[in-house]
């Protein structure tokens, strides 16, 4: 067996292949990791040469680091999720422990003082026993406050107690049954809040779901505050009742010790203050800690990046040498957050609209209260004065609400129109500033769809929908608060539907966002097909392919229809679930509320108000679910738009050096190039070419050899894969593209005119040109005579792409457009091929005149175009095969140029 030996070149090749594989593997791993944590990788480019822009600045990844409090720990996804789960458990233990303590304090207080409530129908004996049949000593009944009346419902579930219960109360025990019920409820409620928060984090990393998570967290904290307030208020009420009763009834206060072991009020003023202080001092830090833990959870859910300081860079690079792959990273925020940031210029209008929105929402919240008042008047007092005042209040509320709604709608719509107009301007700017290679890869119809369809979806979301979202959010929060005030038991019963709605919303939201993006993609396909057919209708008609493209367009439309059908099914299922759950909840609330009315614990007016608030809440939830659909569609559409926003052009449109006194010499050195759409197919292969000032260079050769590519490279439509192109010895990559292209006159093989007048198209090369200069340029291009024959002369509209002019007329207008620019370099891509012999001769005379002291490159298959060139360059398969004058190359009978001329002369004969 012989051992295979590798030379140095083979070793270097193997090493290079291995490094590329490792780099691809690392990039793939990074992409998967970033996608998991919500980083959009659509525009990430890992290249040794291309930099990515962060806030307008190009930064390498080695200068960036994860900007979270955990970046030094290098946590993977499993470790992050484990920490998040641990935080949720700690949060649950903290809040549950706090609420259990509150319940223990509350029910202990209630048990020690319940014998002083006048509702207890019990008698005492001298021995301290209690007899249900004995007559209690008369004691003054304290007048409770409205708050205490509301809070006493927690304990006034019975109106009489037997002796064993009183003895248990006298012993200082508390009602274990109710303590267990309420503590269990609190634990379940907080568990629900935390579980919902966790579900939202698991199902999505988007900004909107994390915002909902924050709202849920705040609701949990508000519940804590309400619970603490109830406890403090009830303790104060109990303490006041004890003091009042003991001071007015010596029989009870000075009776047997079995009534009250301590012959003093349960809490004096000092102790009450101490209890309140303890609740506040313990509760507030716990709430802050709870919020901090959730902020940490969000920190673990997103990867953010910051620029390293010199000290951090040194530390990070020393400990992470494997990170030195020179990859580029682009930082992106969630699309919703970016849309909000883009709307900052409209912030004053939005704030004014928000004020009107608050008034509009408050009037909606006030209506159920006054409707309930009217019902209560009809059911009880039958007072016309109360009826009139309540009705008048409703009329005033309606007027205020109408005016507020008018102002709100107007301002939000105005802000939305300004916002979307700026989005479209920025999007169009981003599109036209991309390099030419980008347009080779993207279809025109798809880009037009981004400008029209996707922008329209965003417009609807940021105008009407955003105002409605804020309005219904305020109504939901206000309705929940007023429901708690009206009857907290029924409110808690109603909130049982929230878990079902929340989980449905999360699952539905993910599905809608996915379908929304697919729907916009299919619309873009159909737009592309339609644009191509309409713009090339003459070709379609000449081949009688109308039905073929109708079928193709129908196929594209059918694709969007199928996705739209899935979207409709998802929307229908979600709406059905929401409606069913909401209606069942209303039926249950009506039943329980009616029982409370029959028991006398709830008034008819309060039940009416409660039902109206419930209906308002249900309608608001239903509207928000519909708005969520539109928002998720908008987010899906914004994905496409922000991909264009974030894409950094490979070739800048401006910025760079400007040469004060240019000579006009161009040199191509070892240029290799392949088009972005065909990266494996080399078009230019090590091409070397020098173009001197004032010389005419003709490029000839078989079709597909690379002649037009050379023109595109000189114009810097593309950058070479390797090698360089210099202008007066300076690489054109260092030159200002605006200045550089300003000294180049270009006439393409298929000149394109814009849908304006002939004058507009000629002045496209020089916006400041006078009418005399326009006419002079047209005369030099032999275009003035046919322009004057038109009824409107130079103001004649040429139609889309110059469709109203003949091929020769379009060519001459394009030449005039190049001439008026007074360029230093002329690029003529078969510029006279569309002219007849006489026009070509006249145009050639004009071109010969403006060629003096200019660098000229001309591509032509016609012998007459290149016969007077200083140098003829034969390009075949991306290489220069021959170079010399026309006579020199013609004398080479075996050369490509000789054969080309011979074939053309034969065809002319």
Swiss-Prot record:
Example GO BP: chemotaxis
Domain ABC transporter intervals: 666-902
ABC transmembrane type-1 domain segment(s): 350-633
A single cellular component GO annotation: membrane
Record's keyword annotation contains Ribonucleoprotein: no
Database matches in InterPro entries: AAA+_ATPase, ABC1_TM_dom, ABC1_TM_sf, ABC_transporter-like_ATP-bd, ABC_transporter-like_CS, P-loop_NTPase, Type_1_exporter
Skewed-composition ranges (Low complexity): 125-134
Official protein name in the record: ABC transporter B family member 1
Gene: abcB1
